[in-house]
């Protein structure tokens, strides 16, 4: 079913054309990513589709009964309600129905036989409608979203207005997810999410019953969630089938194909023109030359494929090599003034050439640890020891090292006054600051431009140990790839914090998982880390199961169970645990089937066959309904108490 059509849409800001003849189609259960460079017009397009911006030309066609939900970047809720109360406002209509049902129940209790039948019919209709709209499920849905987005540990009395900006944005996302619109429009939904929350959101969106339109710079997320990609480049859009990786492959293959066709035509043109030039003046060949010239005139000459827009181009060098041991942290305890310790007795070591990713939930203290390592914060106790010849370069995710009042050129030149202006300008050019861009004040730059400027300063430092705090924040997808390639070739040592799992996978040789009291080390990339975490969880589950089997029967608070009661309780407990295992196995199979179906939808032979696509969507719909029912049963069984 068609949910939305965008036809020949154009948008300008002043003399600048941002979008030109954009075409986009959204069908039910489509998962569409809009990608492109920073400033390409992705967010502008989402705002137009959501009805928050006007446009000059084109049309947007949407059936009247289709609902849309839009989450803009940096959107946050501000309310005096508690976190849970705010999310429950989504279901005010169900609470009103529930109240009406309670009133009718009281009426039925007091009604005479003549009225009762009529009231019961009305009550049955209302109860069925309440059930169909999720009346018996919505509180569980709220709990699930609160848990998934990392709010389960908050006190029930926590008010929305007391949350940080990032937490308010997360809550706004949760509220939007609960509304279940037919078309979910998300602009950078992965901002402010830690890795656990990102994983939960991926699973949630994979099973979402409506269509999704996303702008995101998280490649791992896009690979997991989307099945179509629209690239916005040079104000125009182009559609690709499959996830983000498939889009990259198709784009590269199309460019190579177009380039070969262009070069072949250019060779043909050159040969024809050469024949005309050599033979036009000769009487014996004039007619043939004129024929070739007409052939040239009739030819539809191809434009040279443009390929990608200009990319940043940089690399990180070092002035001198460090000793083998680069950093040793021993029993480090860190706290803020008048606060309990954030980190306690943390220890780890880095050697030359390692690339270590520091991961952990939001608020655990990752950035605090990095700031302590560079001496911006002082530890309460413990030691930080650097090896011989270690020089440290630090990248701050908030770009606090930049001076907002300076010009871009001066920001670098003041730091390295010994370098000639030409070299400074060349360096800035490598980071896409050209011409008058270098004369802009720093405060006028976008987040992505500030990130590139901070990286330019870091490059000139030539330190042999780089400590990076969220270096991919604000960078577009292309700039992330350039940064990755530069860091892969970097001859020094790396310690970095990042929520970008694709980035971690490419860069990390070791993952350090930070908790409040220690660091757990994993010798591999992100995929290795997640594999080991899964193994650990499965092992813990097995151990808990064994403990449960060994544990003596629970004693009732008022009296001991009789032998028969004990026997019956054990029987039911075994049945409950067996059913949990059955559900978990079935859920895994269903999720694999959904994933397999999503992969099929990326196959050209399938997505070009409309009947096959409809059949797969119908199968996924059925699988998702079954999955929802099983997960609901699993939750009930898991929380069941004697």
Swiss-Prot record:
Compositional bias annotation for Basic and acidic residues: 541-550, 557-567
Family matches, as SUPFAM superfamilies: P-loop containing nucleoside triphosphate hydrolases
* Record-listed ATP 1 binding positions: 36-43
One Pfam entry for this protein is ABC_tran_CTD
MF annotations from Gene Ontology = ATP binding; ATP hydrolysis activity; DNA binding
Binding sites annotated in the UniProt record for ATP 2? 360-367
Q: Gene3D superfamilies this protein is in?
A: P-loop containing nucleotide triphosphate hydrolases, Valyl-tRNA synthetase, C-terminal domain
Q: Cite the CDD domains for this sequence.
A: ABCF_EF-3
Give the ABC transporter domain ranges.
Answer: 4-259, 327-541
UniProt entry keywords in alphabetical sequence: ATP-binding, Nucleotide-binding, Repeat
**Cleaved signal peptide residues:** none
| Residue numbers spanned by region Disordered | 541-567
The UniProt family comment states: Belongs to the ABC transporter superfamily. ABCF family. YdiF subfamily.
- Protein name stated in the entry: Putative ATP-binding protein YdiF
Which species is listed as the source? Bacillus subtilis (strain 168)
Gene designation per UniProt: ydiF
